[in-house]
């Protein structure tokens, strides 16, 4: 997440067009967008760490056959767990309920689910970057991705987003591992009566998921995010042309009038600003105040058209809106 946070700070004053349903939406800052990416990874990592802690603290050592601990010393599980904790420096602890710990692998399923969530976050981030870097002439073109594999077998000069696409493929594999682990925890498949028999497969899939995610995250940052560049001219140019600029006029001229203005601007090929000036809906000074893109990236501080306190990539009020 550090690379994403760095970009969020670097580009926090650049205003761009937000997009929902792949359609133009109201303005936002590039820094806010990247703060959302960073928060995804940070939240996912925190959730995974909590799940891994619960997994480490649920060792079924000492339960023997069915969880009763027959034919073993009463302190066997505690002592072995303590020894493992000391040698490996991992917070291992004996399970508090051996019947749950041996008959199921619910904590493994939970931990795998958190890894799947990280995979989904990485896939979303990689795909968004790929979309924002589409072009260079006929796509969105807001981001310029590092040319890690320039050229095409048939199209000279083409640069494909291969790092983003490789990360997306890795995340598919992690999600496949999660399905396998979930199946291993099912009653009648892995978990049956007093013993889960699928731990070899579940452990292998879990370890492979961790390896894949670690490598993918490292490569995404080193080979893509660190070298990302922003085409500020393109990003800010979209903002002025966006019909959603009229959203800020709705509280002033009414929703229906703002919608009518957007339709007229679209039909005439004019911007919202140009159309509003032509129709003389507001005085030029007032129009300039309400059509200030930067003020649209924050909550209104009382109808003045000026923004309130900064939130998003600065971290003062959490994630971006």
Residue ranges and their predicted role:
Residues 1-321:
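Conserved, well-structured ligand/cofactor-binding cores
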């Amino acid at each position: 997440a550090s690379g994403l946070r760095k970009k969020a700070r670097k580009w926090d004053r650049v205003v761009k067009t937000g997009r929902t349903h792949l359609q133009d939406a109201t303005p936002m800052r590039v820094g806010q967008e990247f703060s959302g990416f960073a928060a995804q990874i940070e939240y996912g990592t925190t959730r995974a760490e909590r799940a891994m802690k619960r997994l480490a603290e649920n060792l079924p050592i000492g339960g023997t056959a069915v969880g009763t601990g027959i034919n073993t010393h009463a302190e066997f599980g505690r002592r072995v767990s303590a020894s493992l904790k000391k040698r490996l420096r991992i917070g291992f602890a004996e399970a508090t309920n051996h019947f749950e710990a041996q008959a199921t692998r619910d904590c493994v399923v939970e931990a795998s689910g958190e890894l799947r969530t990280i995979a989904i976050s990485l896939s979303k981030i990689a795909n968004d970057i790929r979309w924002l870097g589409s072009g260079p002439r006929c796509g969105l073109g807001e981001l310029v991705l590092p040319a890690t594999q320039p050229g095409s077998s048939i199209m000279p000069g083409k640069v494909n987003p291969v790092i983003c696409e490789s990360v997306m493929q890795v995340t598919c594999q992690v999600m496949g591992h999660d399905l396998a682990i979930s199946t291993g925890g099912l009653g009648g498949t892995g978990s049956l009566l007093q013993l889960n028999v699928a731990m070899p497969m579940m452990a292998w899939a879990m370890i492979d998921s961790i390896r894949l995610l670690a490598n993918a995250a490292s490569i995404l940052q080193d080979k893509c995010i660190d070298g990302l560049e922003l085409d500020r001219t393109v990003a800010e140019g979209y903002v002025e042309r966006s019909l959603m600029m009229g959203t800020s006029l709705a509280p002033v001229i009414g929703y229906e009038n703002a919608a009518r203005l957007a339709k007229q601007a679209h039909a005439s090929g004019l911007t919202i600003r140009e159309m509003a000036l032509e129709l003389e809906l507001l005085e030029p000074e007032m129009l300039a105040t309400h059509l200030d893109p930067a003020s649209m990236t924050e909550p209104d501080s009382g109808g003045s058209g000026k923004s309130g306190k900064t939130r998003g990539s600065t971290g003062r009020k959490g994630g971006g809106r």
